[in-house]
Design a protein with these regions (language model features):
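Residues that flank catalytic or metal-binding motifs in active/ligand-binding sites
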Residues: 4-6, 21, 146-148
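Propeptide-to-catalytic entry region of secreted or membrane-anchored zinc metalloproteases
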Residues: 15-139, 143
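Short pre-active-site segment immediately N-terminal to the catalytic Zn-binding motif
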Residues: 146-159
Length: 159
């Protein structure tokens, strides 16, 4: 194949010598949207779901420190967001997934509070106990045009 760069710009930044990651964990507790087939998807997280997410985040925090022998640490802010997600994206390749555009207006106020190195968005897309299941073919992460989501928001907030 052939590849090339166009409109390439090299900028100088400041080196951050900190080994601590500032992470935002956004727990999106509710979805209320129409699916491609016209059906309504309405899911609300239960307290046990939120507790499970918080427990996993604590394990992530301790695992980063342990696995790097203290060379990387994590501090995070957790935001429980009750405003429902009104759209979710669908593609034949991936099924349903949360695209940054689906939640951007909801999460931007939280992300503008401080600078984050990484963003976790926790969403429940199904509930087997209630027989709610939608096709999700792969975990694809929150990216847009090959850029990590937090970089997009830093750019938009800075403008």
């Amino acid at each position: 194949g052939i590849a090339w760069f166009s409109d390439f710009k090299l900028e100088e930044g400041t080196k951050n010598k900190s080994n601590n990651w500032n992470v935002a964990c956004l727990i999106m507790k509710n979805i209320d949207t129409k699916l491609e087939d016209g059906k309504t998807l309405k899911i609300n997280m239960e307290p046990k779901d939120v507790d499970n997410i918080k427990s996993n985040m604590e394990r992530f925090k301790s695992a980063c420190k342990t696995l790097t022998d203290g060379k990387m640490t994590v501090e995070y802010d957790t935001y429980e967001i009750t405003e429902p997600i009104k759209t979710i994206t669908y593609s034949d390749e991936y099924g349903y997934y949360i695209d940054p555009s689906d939640v951007e207006s909801i999460v931007t106020p939280y992300l503008s509070k401080k600078e984050y190195d990484y963003i976790f968005v926790a969403v429940r897309l199904g509930d087997l106990d209630k027989n709610i299941e939608i096709p999700v073919y792969d975990w694809i992460g929150l990216r847009r045009n090959g850029l990590t989501w937090n970089r997009i928001f830093k750019y938009k907030i800075a403008k």
